[in-house]
Structures are given as structure tokens and as C-alpha cells.
């Protein structure tokens, strides 16, 4: 009698490899690894899943879909959770969940498994997303169920022939994709400890970065980054290239004590060189092209959208409504930003746009000025009228 199939979100690490061995007692395990730009050896991961006991192993390249359908939303909405975290891991979980559900439907599986612990945000993101896409799918979380210590997990792995990674003594827990790299655990758990250089993986220390600045130009079309230094690139490729260029200059290091969805505080080290550079450049083009009312209201939407995405609600109607608003604002966001990369900083030093609302003839203080200064007198009287009336009423009441 054949076993029921379970779709496992597989990373190739110890947790999900041990999960295969544990799950295969009752299920035929189908391991699925998504390539969201983390730079892993995908052939090795594919083969390892089969070696450990999966009946099928899938490695799916979703970098382009991740960039255009998920990262772009965060980019255009300047998504920083608590004004610091560019939602690196939070962005990939809805896409991974979507693909797991699609594969479950394709092969007729009714169960999905993930390797999250019981104290992180990702368990919530996976399970809420999966439920939003198919309420009938069952979700199991072996790592959360075991509650094993690391030592117990290693012992189980060795007893069951699961290869134990050579770098298992690495104290850090790392997650990486196109939009950045997240690092936690080990010495980082004490917020008084400065993050050692070994905790960083894709950025150069600003102190060791080049002593000469580098200037780059990023072009945007309707809010989408379309070219880097004149070279037209797919969004995923552009981000990866920016990660290398800006990372070399130490851009995008973030040290954050954040409020997790599950109720605890966590100290995280993020490296987001491409993200920080793009977000900085994009904001400057918006400053040229958005009318004042949109420019002032959009940050309110951005903050709420960042919270919704962080808090596992990508597929909620609220999130989708706010995304629609963001997309509407981007129709005029066209132009090029020149960015100076130097010693950990990404600074926009020049910008231009065919949709620019900046009129130099109105702004200038030279003889070329076309601003009607005489109109200011009447404007001031009308603008200040409510304040004047209020002041007079207060005086008469005394």
C-alpha cells in the first residue's frame, strides 16, 4: 500500500534533512527547494534530498517571479519594518508557500511540511499563506514538534545516516535571497555584543571598502528599475549586480532589535546592499515626480503595508488593496538617479526625470524667475485666516 505524499519545503540544511528521515516513516516525501537567489549549490541540494530519503526532489528557479511579483512591491513601497528591516525573509515566504501549494495540487498531495521552529515568524508566514491559498491542505512542522536541542538533532541525524554539515559549529542562522541576507543566533543574541566581521557575508566592512567613491546610474520606468549604468537588465539580474557593486562599498549593513510577530524581541543582522541602494534612488525619483499630497500620504500606506507583509498577511485583502494603491502612484515615477557609493553610504547626488514636477524657472532666485511673488500676499492672507480667527476668538474670550 502506497503512502500519502507530503510536500516538504527543503533547504538542504540539517533541520529539513532530518525532517525527511522522520517524515518518511509515514509519508512519501517530495522535497521542494526554491531558488530565490540565495546562491546555494542547487544540484547538491537536489541530490541530497534523494540521498536522505525523499522519493522526489524538485529545485525550482523562482528568482524572476520573486523579483517582479514580491520584491518590486517592497521596493516601490519603501518597505522597512520598524523603519529598518527591508523584509528580506518575509517577502520570500508567500512565494514559497504559493509554489508548495501548486505542487501539492499537481501531484495530489494533501499535506505540506516546513522546517520552522516554534518561536520564529516564518512558521506563521508559511501556515497563514498556505491556508489562504487552500484551506484543505494540512500543514505539519516536524522541528516545532520535536522541540529537540541541537545536540539531540545531530545525534538523530548520525543514527539515521543523515549527512551532518561540516560547518555545523557555525553559530549563526542565515537566510538569504535576492533582496538581502539575514543573520541571527550565536554571539548576536546579546544585543550588547558588536557583530563581528565574520557575521557578514555579502558586504565589505566600510573601513575596508575602497577609498575612492563609485558613481552609478539607475533608471526607473513607472517605478521599476530597468537599467544600471545604461545596461538594460531584468529586475532579478539588476538586483544581483547591485548587491555585488554596493556590497563592495559596505552599503546596506543593518543591526536591528525587532519586535517579532510571536511576541519576543530578536536581534538581527541584515545585509541589503542592492535593496538599500535601490530604495534610496527610487525615493529621490519620487521626490521629483509625485504631487505633494501623494508624497505625504504614501509613507502612511508604506508603513502599514510593511507591517502587514512582516506579519504574515501577504494574501490578505488589506495587503492587496494597499499594493493596488502603491502601483497607482508609480505611473509617473520615471527618471534616472546618480548614486555615490562610498564607505557604507549610498547617496543620491543627482537626479532627472521626464515626468519631473520640479520647474527650475519657478524655483530659481535668479533673474530667470517666473514665480509670481505678488500672488503670495493674497495666499498668505487666506492660508493664515483660520489661525487669525482662532487667535481673535481666544483673545475675546479672556
From Swiss-Prot:
Protein name according to UniProt: Argininosuccinate synthase
Name of the gene: argG
Binding sites annotated in the UniProt record for L-citrulline: 85, 121, 125, 173, 258, 270
PROSITE patterns: ARGININOSUCCIN_SYN_1, ARGININOSUCCIN_SYN_2
EC identifiers of the protein: 6.3.4.5
Residues that hold ATP according to the record: 9-17, 115
One Pfam short name: Arginosuc_syn_C
GO molecular-function terms, A-Z: argininosuccinate synthase activity; ATP binding
Subunit: Homotetramer.
Originating organism: Streptococcus pneumoniae serotype 2 (strain D39 / NCTC 7466)
Compartments, record wording: Cytoplasm
GO terms for cellular component: cytoplasm
Chain segments annotated as coiled-coil in the UniProt record: none
GO annotation terms (biological process): argininosuccinate metabolic process; L-arginine biosynthetic process; urea cycle
InterPro entries, per the entry: Arginosuc_syn_C (IPR048268), Arginosuc_syn_N (IPR048267), Arginosuc_synth (IPR001518), Arginosuc_synth_CS (IPR018223), Arginosuc_synth_type_1_subfam (IPR023434), AS_cat/multimer_dom_body (IPR024074), Rossmann-like_a/b/a_fold (IPR014729)
Chemical reaction(s) catalysed: L-citrulline + L-aspartate + ATP = 2-(N(omega)-L-arginino)succinate + AMP + diphosphate + H(+)
Key words of the record: Amino-acid biosynthesis, Arginine biosynthesis, ATP-binding, Cytoplasm, Ligase, Nucleotide-binding
Pathway(s) the chain acts in: Amino-acid biosynthesis; L-arginine biosynthesis; L-arginine from L-ornithine and carbamoyl phosphate: step 2/3
Protein's UniProt keywords contain Ligase: yes
Amino acid at each position: 500500500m502506497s503512502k500519502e505524499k507530503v510536500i516538504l519545503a527543503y533547504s538542504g540544511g540539517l533541520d529539513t534533512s532530518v525532517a525527511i528521515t522522520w517524515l518518511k516513516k509515514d509519508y512519501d516525501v517530495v522535497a521542494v527547494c526554491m531558488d530565490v537567489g540565495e546562491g546555494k549549490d542547487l544540484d547538491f541540494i537536489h541530490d541530497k534530498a534523494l540521498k536522505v530519503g525523499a522519493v522526489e526532489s524538485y529545485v525550482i528557479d523562482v528568482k524572476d517571479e520573486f523579483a517582479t511579483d514580491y520584491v518590486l512591491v517592497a521596493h516601490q513601497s519603501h518597505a522597512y519594518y520598524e523603519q529598518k528591516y527591508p523584509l528580506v525573509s518575509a517577502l520570500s515566504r508567500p512565494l514559497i508557500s504559493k509554489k508548495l501549494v501548486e505542487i501539492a495540487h499537481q501531484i495530489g498531495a494533501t499535506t505540506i511540511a516546513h522546517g520552522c521552529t516554534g518561536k520564529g515568524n516564518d512558521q506563521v508566514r508559511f501556515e497563514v499563506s498556505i491556508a489562504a491559498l487552500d484551506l484543505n491542505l494540512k500543514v505539519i512542522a516536524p522541528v516545532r514538534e520535536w522541540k529537540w536541542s541541537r545536540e539531540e538533532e545531530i545525534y538523530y541525524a548520525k543514527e539515521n545516516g543523515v549527512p551532518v554539515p561540516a560547518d555545523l559549529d557555525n553559530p549563526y542562522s542565515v537566510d538569504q535571497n535576492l533582496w538581502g541576507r539575514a543573520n541571527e543566533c550565536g554571539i548576536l543574541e546579546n544585543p550588547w555584543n558588536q557583530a563581528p566581521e565574520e557575521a557578514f557575508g555579502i558586504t565589505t566592512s566600510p573601513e575596508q571598502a575602497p577609498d575612492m567613491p563609485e558613481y552609478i546610474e539607475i533608471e526607473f520606468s513607472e517605478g521599476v528599475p530597468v537599467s544600471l549604468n545604461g545596461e538594460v537588465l531584468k529586475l532579478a539580474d539588476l538586483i544581483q549586480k547591485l548587491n555585488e557593486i554596493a556590497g563592495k562599498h559596505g552599503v546596506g549593513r543593518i543591526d536591528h532589535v525587532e519586535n517579532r510577530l510571536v511576541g519576543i524581541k530578536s536581534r538581527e543582522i541584515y545585509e541589503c546592499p542592492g535593496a538599500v541602494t535601490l530604495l534610496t534612488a527610487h525615493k529621490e525619483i519620487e521626490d521629483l515626480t509625485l504631487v505633494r499630497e501623494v508624497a505625504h500620504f504614501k509613507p502612511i500606506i508604506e508603513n502599514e503595508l510593511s507591517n502587514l507583509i512582516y506579519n504574515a498577511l501577504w494574501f490578505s485583502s488589506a495587503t492587496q488593496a494597499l499594493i493596488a494603491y502603491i502601483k497607482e502612484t508609480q505611473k509617473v515615477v520615471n527618471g534616472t538617479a546618480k548614486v555615490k557609493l562610498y564607505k557604507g553610504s549610498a547617496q543620491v547626488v543627482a537626479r532627472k526625470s521626464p515626468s519631473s514636477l520640479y520647474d527650475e524657472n519657478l524655483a530659481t532666485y535668479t533673474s530667470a524667475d517666473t514665480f509670481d511673488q505678488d500672488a503670495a500676499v493674497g495666499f498668505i492672507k487666506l492660508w493664515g485666516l483660520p489661525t487669525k480667527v482662532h487667535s481673535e476668538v481666544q483673545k475675546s474670550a479672556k
